[in-house]
């Protein structure tokens, strides 16, 4: 029994190390194409705080506000996110900009830690506010569905996102490349939406 436990721990550690190496490799490949605007988790929090008043009123297509419960405080926490809805599922990704991914490839944002502690969330997006249950994606079939939704969908606001994060003029191809980078280095999640919206 103890040998099985040790074998499982070794396999888990090896998988985590392999994932971190993958994230670092992708980040190194893309780093030169990214602008240096968002370099840390603090920069991301600041950007989210600046967008929050606007997104809370009327989020643009492909974006929204996720509300989690703080794992330590129990208070509600809101974060602006890119979110793509497919039926009763909404896909989102925790981002790791290249500078962060190179330094800390396993970095987890506070809102993801909150979801791990309490997966019940509210999601404000086009179409209303929805209660839901969030979880990280690990199954290959679900990851492929999420990748298609997140990387192949381009909305008008994505051009501004691309202009902020990548060097040069934004194009549809560059937006898809940026979203592919976020997906490959980030933490993909799904929110299973309740059938009735809250508002």
Go through the PLM ranges and name each one:
Residues 22-25, 97-174, 178-187, 194-197:
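Short, structured beta-strand-loop surface elements
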Residues 6-19:
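Compositionally biased, intrinsically disordered low-complexity segments enriched
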């Amino acid at each position: 029994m103890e040998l099985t436990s040790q074998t499982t721990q070794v396999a888990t550690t090896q998988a985590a190390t392999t994932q971190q190496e993958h994230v670092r490799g992708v980040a190194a490949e893309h780093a030169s194409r990214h602008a240096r605007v968002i370099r840390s988790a603090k920069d991301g929090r600041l950007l989210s705080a600046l967008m929050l008043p606007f997104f809370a009123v009327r989020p643009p297509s492909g974006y929204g506000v996720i509300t989690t419960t703080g794992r330590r405080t129990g208070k509600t926490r809101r974060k602006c996110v890119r979110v793509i809805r497919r039926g009763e599922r909404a896909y989102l990704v925790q981002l790791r900009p290249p500078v962060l991914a190179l330094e800390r490839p396993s970095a987890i944002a506070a809102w993801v830690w909150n979801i791990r502690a309490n997966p019940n969330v509210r999601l404000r997006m086009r179409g209303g506010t929805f209660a839901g249950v969030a979880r990280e994606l690990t199954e290959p079939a679900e990851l492929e569905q999420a990748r298609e939704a997140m990387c192949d969908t381009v909305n008008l606001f994505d051009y501004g996102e691309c202009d902020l994060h990548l060097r040069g003029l934004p194009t549809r191809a560059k937006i898809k490349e940026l979203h592919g980078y976020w997906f490959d280095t980030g933490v993909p999640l799904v929110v299973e939406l309740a059938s009735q919206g809250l508002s």
